[in-house]
Amino acid sequence: MPFIYINTALAYSMSLLGLLIYRSHLMSSLLCLEGMMLSLFIMMTTMTLNMHLMLMYMLPIILLVFAACEAAVGLALLILISNLYGLDYVQNLNLLQC
């Protein structure tokens, strides 16, 4: 297994571990999710380039589009919660129900 695959798998697992540890704060959770998306992007890009799969060249770009949408929605929720409550705890998401 090449060295870059080991590094990206380690980065993904560290981001997942950070997400599990710091799940009470929304900002920390969003940063860990972005780290997971970045490591997935690097892994998918290297795999498509190494295997020469022509049909999968657009897949990492689609992943980046979904990651950008996820980040935008997460930051909008973070700003909304911070303005309403002054804290970024995930428990405040339950208070936003209509």
From Swiss-Prot:
Domain of life, per lineage: Eukaryota
Swiss-Prot/TrEMBL catalytic activity: a ubiquinone + NADH + 5 H(+)(in) = a ubiquinol + NAD(+) + 4 H(+)(out)
InterPro entries given in the database record: NADH_UbQ_OxRdtase_chain4L/K, NUOK/Mnh_C1-like
Transmembrane segments: 1-21, 29-49, 61-81
Keywords from the named record: Electron transport, Membrane, Mitochondrion, Mitochondrion inner membrane, NAD, Respiratory chain, Translocase, Transmembrane, Transmembrane helix, Transport, Ubiquinone
EC numbers for this chain: 7.1.1.2
UniProt keyword Transit peptide, yes or no: no
Topology within the bilayer: Multi-pass membrane protein
Localization per Swiss-Prot or TrEMBL: Mitochondrion inner membrane
Molecular-function annotations in GO: NADH dehydrogenase (ubiquinone) activity
Gene3D superfamilies linked: 1.10.287.3510
GO cellular component: mitochondrial inner membrane; respiratory chain complex I
One biological process term in Gene Ontology: ATP synthesis coupled electron transport
Major location category of this protein: mitochondrion
Protein's job: Core subunit of the mitochondrial membrane respiratory chain NADH dehydrogenase (Complex I) which catalyzes electron transfer from NADH through the respiratory chain, using ubiquinone as an electron acceptor. Part of the enzyme membrane arm which is embedded in the lipid bilayer and involved in proton translocation.
Family, as annotated: Belongs to the complex I subunit 4L family.
Assembly, per entry: Core subunit of respiratory chain NADH dehydrogenase (Complex I) which is composed of 45 different subunits.
PANTHER family, per the entry: NADH-UBIQUINONE OXIDOREDUCTASE CHAIN 4L (PTHR11434:SF0), NADH-UBIQUINONE OXIDOREDUCTASE SUBUNIT ND4L (PTHR11434)
Protein's recorded name: NADH-ubiquinone oxidoreductase chain 4L
Source organism phylogeny: Eukaryota, Metazoa, Chordata, Craniata, Vertebrata
